[in-house]
């Protein structure tokens, strides 16, 4: 048997992982500015944590979850999304307690799992970056969180992004709209796709965002949620729209957008960009004021979003955006002869302990091959260390770009390479 990675997964090799590290680090920096702190939850949860919160009738639960019974006969699932685990953690760890500052702001990053057909930007093990804010029902929280997502996408370089905005209202508004939608779609049931016929019985709002052609035709004249908002829901949505306009964040009202998870209420949103004629959602989220109470906590407002790292990187690649990744070595040490082996190890360690990114040859190769390695590593400086240099205690340090050289002692390199580095035209941080 040929051992290969499972279908729908990928190996993220060094050339790619540098991009991942950049995106993750960039997200952390943006989130810190908004006073978010990281939370890390298990990659598997009890099945009910996901099924009951996401919705028993959603595609995630009915078709896509990786679930199994462990050796203790506990029903376990690999997490398919990030919000439910964070809410579970919030409640279990009593972060709703009065002594915890509100709103409580958390971000997470990590792998998620869904059994679906693998395609570009969508894998069975995928990675998500997300945020969750607990304790504020203020529409300004909706807008701040959406603005933070827009801030991140703009600064990382995603182009042509459009914000699609909708509201699902409060539970009363949503229930009234749900019934109106059932009344509208029931006479059209036979024209719907098989999936949407099932959705009509279980979760009729999901018919609205079906990608099937026949479903799109059926919902063209469907009633709008905006016509079923009560005063509270209308006031909240009006405030969100006004504050987005105040911040200069453009948006499109999309009344057919409902999101795929059952826990949303009031504001929902997606950031969408067009790639090769297809609309791709790069970031999405919304408000979920009932989820904390559903998990056994007190009534607590919530708002958050998630974005897929694979899809984000795919869009950046398709748009020709080059991330500013620094892969260059500061120093490469070419080693000549067995007599220089031990000293080369001492020297490279001393450089690393001073904060320099350094490498040396370990393979006793000819100098030409070692110099080629220095070029592959884009080494800024090059030191050639042979037995004669070890004996004399003096060595040449070369700027590998300009070929400028300086003669220095091994002791100086070991104790203060910064001075030499700067003399050759480079700057230390």
From Swiss-Prot:
Q: Name one GO molecular function term.
A: transferase activity
Keyword match Oxidoreductase: no
Tell me the keywords, alphabetical order: Aminoacyl-tRNA synthetase, ATP-binding, Cytoplasm, Ligase, Nucleotide-binding, Protein biosynthesis
| Alphabetical list of Gene3D superfamilies matching this protein | Anticodon-binding domain, Bira Bifunctional Protein, Domain 2
Its top-level enzyme class, in one word, is ligase
* TM helices/strands, residue ranges: none
User: What biological processes does GO assign it?
Assistant: histidyl-tRNA aminoacylation
Q: Under which EC number(s) is this enzyme classified?
A: 6.1.1.21
Q: Which PANTHER family match?
A: HISTIDINE--TRNA LIGASE, MITOCHONDRIAL-RELATED (PTHR43707:SF1), HISTIDYL-TRNA SYNTHETASE (PTHR43707)
Could you tell me what this protein is called?
A: Histidine--tRNA ligase
According to the entry, what is the taxonomic lineage of the organism? Bacteria, Bacillati, Bacillota, Bacilli, Lactobacillales
């Amino acid at each position: 048997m040929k051992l290969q990675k499972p279908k729908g997964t990928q190996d993220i090799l060094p050339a790619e992982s540098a991009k991942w590290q950049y995106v993750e680090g960039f997200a952390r920096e943006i989130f810190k500015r908004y006073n978010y702190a990281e939370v890390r939850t298990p990659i598997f949860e009890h099945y009910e944590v996901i099924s009951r919160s996401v919705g028993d009738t959603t595609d995630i639960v009915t078709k896509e979850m990786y679930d199994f019974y462990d050796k203790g006969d506990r029903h376990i699932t690999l997490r398919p999304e990030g919000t439910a685990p964070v809410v579970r953690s919030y409640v279990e760890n009593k972060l709703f307690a009065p002594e915890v500052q509100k709103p409580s702001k958390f971000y997470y990053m990590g792998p998620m799992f869904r059994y679906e057909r693998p395609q570009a930007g969508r894998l069975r093990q995928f990675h998500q970056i997300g945020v969750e804010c607990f304790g504020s029902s203020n529409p300004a929280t909706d807008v701040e969180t959406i603005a933070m997502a827009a801030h991140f996408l703009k600064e990382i370089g995603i182009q042509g992004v459009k914000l699609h905005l909708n509201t699902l209202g409060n539970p009363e508004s949503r229930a009234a709209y749900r019934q109106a939608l059932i009344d509208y779609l029931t006479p059209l049931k036979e024209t719907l796709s098989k999936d949407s016929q099932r959705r009509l019985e279980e979760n009729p709002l999901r018919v609205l965002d079906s990608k099937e052609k026949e479903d799109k035709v059926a919902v063209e004249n469907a009633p709008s949620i905006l016509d079923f908002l009560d005063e509270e829901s209308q006031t909240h949505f009006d405030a969100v729209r006004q504050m987005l306009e105040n911040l200069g964040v453009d948006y499109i009202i999309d009344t057919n957008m409902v999101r795929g998870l059952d826990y949303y209420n009031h504001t929902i949103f997606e950031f969408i960009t067009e790639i090769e004629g297809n609309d791709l959602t790069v970031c999405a989220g919304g408000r979920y004021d009932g989820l904390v109470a559903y998990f056994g906590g007190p009534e607590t407002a919530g708002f958050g979003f998630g974005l897929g790292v694979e899809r984000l990187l795919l869009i950046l690649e398709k748009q020709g955006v080059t991330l500013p990744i620094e892969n260059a070595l500061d120093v490469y040490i070419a080693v000549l002869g067995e007599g220089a082996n031990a000293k080369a190890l001492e020297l490279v360690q001393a450089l690393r302990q001073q904060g320099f990114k350094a490498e040396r040859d370990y393979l006793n190769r000819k100098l030409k091959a070692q110099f080629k390695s220095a070029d592959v590593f884009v080494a800024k400086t090059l030191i050639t260390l042979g037995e004669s240099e070890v004996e004399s205690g003096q060595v040449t340090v070369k700027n590998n770009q300009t070929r400028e050289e300086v003669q220095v002692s091994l002791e100086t390199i070991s104790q203060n390479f910064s001075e030499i580095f700067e003399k050759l035209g480079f700057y230390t941080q």
